């Protein structure tokens, strides 16, 4: 049976007083997710392995069944793969955010969601001023970019900037985990401080300030790693061909290493205005020839990081009606059965504006299966589901 996973990044949350003690998933109007839960089986998944930070790379790799202690090499290496960079022996890749600092405060992790066009101009300028034979910046999407350090030591204690909005940034700068990594930590911290000097008066930032927008006035490198040794999903599970649909470099990079076809969708932004319908139709087209599709939607996570409850509810409802609804209605017409799974990768609670490692709700619908008693899809309804809590590769094996 063919299968599709629809992943609402950061969709899970905690009860919110302003919503009458409900979570955004409970409060949102989600007829299609509820219908799939009613027709299918539900439970929770532990997507963050013990000892790991609840990052999207950790959680999404877990959803796909990868053994994190064996294959995890950080976010940077995955994003390098997504832009076609072939990471070589001796090279260290890092995610490099363009962030906004205000005085000594890390104001936000995204520079007010700077456009890719603006960011590309800044990344090229950073290469001119700070690049060398050992240091190179590569443009990604919006605020999410790549830093390659030749000869870097990955044994570093780095803080994801989305975890610490409105905190003083200096105590959060990079620290070595072992004495041998001190040189790399010093190099990267100097790059952070130098970037602030050269970016503060750049024309892109002056224009943004004049328009009332946050400037991208600092880099913030984090999540270092080397080239990972990952099996493809075809090798792990035996299907012939799969695909991934996402606007996020990280997820696309996971797809590259997982052996999945990376599908581009016009208007897929990784933000609230993404092309939900286009992604759904692309998934349907892919399912005609592929055995497996991983459809990832980032919008809920971004709303959680902004701490915007109303926006998070709206993104959940958009995912339900403008993507899952299209898929559900069309797949009901197909002669060939398709299994459908829906879940978040991790919670991104609006109250704290960052990820947690709380197990997430999931549903699996397979035509002809015996459903459990759950009739709504949210963090608490699935506590009555068939599966309890699944770990490691248990979820993906149940689906496939």
Question: Regions from the language model: what does each represent?
Answer:
Residues 1-400:
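Feature captures the catalytic ectodomains and active-site-proximal regions of enzymes
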């Amino acid at each position: 049976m063919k299968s599709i996973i629809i992943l609402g990044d950061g969709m899970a949350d905690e009860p919110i007083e302003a919503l009458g003690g409900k979570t955004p998933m409970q409060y949102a109007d989600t007829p299609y997710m509820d219908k799939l839960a009613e027709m299918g089986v539900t439970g929770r998944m532990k997507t963050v392995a013990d000892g790991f930070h609840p990052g999207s790379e950790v959680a999404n790799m877990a959803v796909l069944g990868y053994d994190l202690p064996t294959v995890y090499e950080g976010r940077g290496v995955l994003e390098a793969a997504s832009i076609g960079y072939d990471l070589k022996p001796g090279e260290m890749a890092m995610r490099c955010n363009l962030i906004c600092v205000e005085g000594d405060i890390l104001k936000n992790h995204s520079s007010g969601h700077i456009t890719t066009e603006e960011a590309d101009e800044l990344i090229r300028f950073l290469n001119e001023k700070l690049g060398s034979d050992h240091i190179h910046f590569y443009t990604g999407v919006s605020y999410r970019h790549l830093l390659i350090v030749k000869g870097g030591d990955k044994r570093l204690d780095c803080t994801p900037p989305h975890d610490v909005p409105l905190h003083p940034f200096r105590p959060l700068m990079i620290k070595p985990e072992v004495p041998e990594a001190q040189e790399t930590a010093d190099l990267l911290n100097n790059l952070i401080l130098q970037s602030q000097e050269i970016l503060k008066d750049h024309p892109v930032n002056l224009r943004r300030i004049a328009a009332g927008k946050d400037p991208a006035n600092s880099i913030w490198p984090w999540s270092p790693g080397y080239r990972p040794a990952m099996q493809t999903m075809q090798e792990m599970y035996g299907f012939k061909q799969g695909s991934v649909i996402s606007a996020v470099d990280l997820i696309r990079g996971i797809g590259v290493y997982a052996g999945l076809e990376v599908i581009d969708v016009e208007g897929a932004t990784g933000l609230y205005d993404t092309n939900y319908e286009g992604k759904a139709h692309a998934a349907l087209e892919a399912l005609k020839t592929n055995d497996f599709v991983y459809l990832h939607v980032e919008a809920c996570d971004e709303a959680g990081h902004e701490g915007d409850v109303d926006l998070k509810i709206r993104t959940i409802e958009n995912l339900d009606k403008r993507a899952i609804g299209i898929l559900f209605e069309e797949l009901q017409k197909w002669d060939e059965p398709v299994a459908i799974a829906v879940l978040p990768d991790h919670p991104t609670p609006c109250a704290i504006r960052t990820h947690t490692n709380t197990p997430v709700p999931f549903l699996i619908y397979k035509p002809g299966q015996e459903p459990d008693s759950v009739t709504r899809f949210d963090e608490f309804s699935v506590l009555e589901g068939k599966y309890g809590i699944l770990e490691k590769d248990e979820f993906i094996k149940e689906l496939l």
